[in-house]
Amino acid sequence: MNISGTLNTLRLLYNPSLCKPSLVVPTFNDLPIPIHDSIKAVVLDKDNCIAFPHDDKIWPDYLQHWETLRSKYSNKALLIVSNTAGSNSDKDYSQAKLLEDKTGIPVLRHSTKKPGCHNEILDYFYRNKTITNPKEVAVVGDRLFTDILMANLMGSYGVWIRDGVKVSANPLSKFEKKLYNFLGF
């Protein structure tokens, strides 16, 4: 269970705009590159964003766009943040290591699941001298209640991958889409 996600989602009761993305695109292939003129670093979710859920490689249809992203942003400016690979539930970080081998991009080792790991993300980019301000970070993900909420908590640019690799049957994901439409963002 993602306690961080559950507790942070309660913030939406008094501030629903925390789940409002800066940009909405159907799939990773629709992500503009560069993402925005001010963006110097990019956080990427893994499952159903750049990879099929629970897979460790870039979705084949996205490979060309992936390489375009990698040519625009350096390895220090790209960071995969997943609630599976690199999280405290990833024993010996074996999933993180495998994902790094397959993608060539660092995977954040984090003690708190999204959206609660936002300080660890910012620390990573500050330590690598990639950014000077959270506004220079784009968070790209398929979940409003984790990825986009985290982007807004960070004061960063949130890109919602609405449909992902496959349209999710997850009830929470379906609820997020209904809420997004209801709120009229």
Curated annotation (Swiss-Prot):
A single GO molecular-function term is: phosphatidylglycerophosphatase activity
Q: In which pathway does it act?
A: Phospholipid metabolism; phosphatidylglycerol biosynthesis; phosphatidylglycerol from CDP-diacylglycerol: step 2/2
Q: What is its EC number?
A: 3.1.3.27
From its record, what is one biological process in GO terms? cardiolipin biosynthetic process
Q: Which residues form a coiled coil?
A: none
Does the UniProt entry include the keyword Secreted? no
Q: What does this protein do?
A: Phosphatidylglycerophosphatase involved in the biosynthesis of cardiolipin (CL), a unique dimeric phosphoglycerolipid predominantly present in mitochondrial membranes and which has important functions for cellular energy metabolism, mitochondrial dynamics and the initiation of apoptotic pathways. Required for the stability of respiratory chain supercomplexes and for growth at elevated temperature, in presence of ethidium bromide or in absence of prohibitins.
Any idea what this protein is called?
A: Phosphatidylglycerophosphatase GEP4, mitochondrial
Biological source species: Saccharomyces cerevisiae (strain ATCC 204508 / S288c)
Q: Give the organism's phylogenetic lineage.
A: Eukaryota, Fungi, Dikarya, Ascomycota, Saccharomycotina
